[in-house]
Amino acid sequence: MEEAIRARGVTRTYRSKGRETVALAGIDLTVPAGATYGLIGRNGAGKTTFIRIASTQLLPTSGSVAVLGHDAVADPRSVRNRIAVIPQESRPLYFLNVYELVYLYLKLRGMPGTEARRRTEAVLVELSLDSRRKTLVSHLSGGMRRRAMVAMVLASDAEVLFLDEPTTGLDPVARREVWSAIERAIRDRRTVLLTTHYLDEAEALSSRLALIEGGRVLLEGTPAEIRSRIPRPFRVSVQGRVTREELLPYGEVAEVRGGHLVFAREEEARELTRLALAKGFPVSMAPASLEDVFLQLVGRPIGEDDPEEEGTA
């Protein structure tokens, strides 16, 4: 298997006001060439810190990262020549219009003018930005500005794309357009490393995933493999006047608005479903989603953040 990104024992520690914060606590990852690899986890889990290290923006405290065979610390220039990055917080050149932003980015990467113009035109249409081509970036909404940054990177000829929360702030239609553009990059055999806390996005785009919590990889594999590794792979949603104590014999119980979620093995899930139906309670049973996997492993929803520290998102 050809490797695009190889990380071994990557740590990152911050010191502030006499206090030490561990952002990464020994990350091992291998991203195959041509794959889309998703890093999922809450804000503060360490996803952005890893992206910044792998894309040569930040030095690790220890460990190593190689991108396309080049060491990100010892040979950062070779890495930068072959990657493109959408940071979590983008700061585009506000005095340019949308067309200029994309076109000049491609020219600065060394792309010939004719090809840069062709790619700029194509990506503006693909991401529904053509009508805004002459709009100054400073006049765009936050979501439109984010979409322009995505256009820059996807129009490039970079072999590895680092996309840190690429669809943050976008409406559902715009998110789907970005997904389609990322899928095109995948078809072009480019490697994509993306972070997201939208689990539907992670599952739709990623051939492999790493679930990160507290600077560590908790689980790694395909979406199907990750779901299969939890002890209770089914979820039963029970509404009505039923107590947590009544449900505990069937599995792990989480309280939700209007009822309970029970994570259970298949036999217990079916038994609980039959019992709830017999008592007239609204009930549904389904295979566990990635959101359910996260909740079982971490004990908190993915949308519930850790206290934010510098660089630890």
Regions found by a protein language model. Give the residues of each.
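A short, flexible loop at the N-terminus of ABC-type nucleotide-binding domains that lies
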Residues: 1-7, 13-26, 76
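Conserved ABC ATPase "signature" region
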Residues: 103, 107, 114-132
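A short, proline-enriched helix->beta-strand linker immediately N-terminal to the Walker B motif
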Residues: 155-159
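Catalytic Walker B motif of ABC-type/P-loop ATPase nucleotide-binding domains
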Residues: 161-165
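ABC ATPase "signature
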Residues: 220-221
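Short, charged/small-residue-rich alpha-helical element at the C-terminal edge
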Residues: 232-304
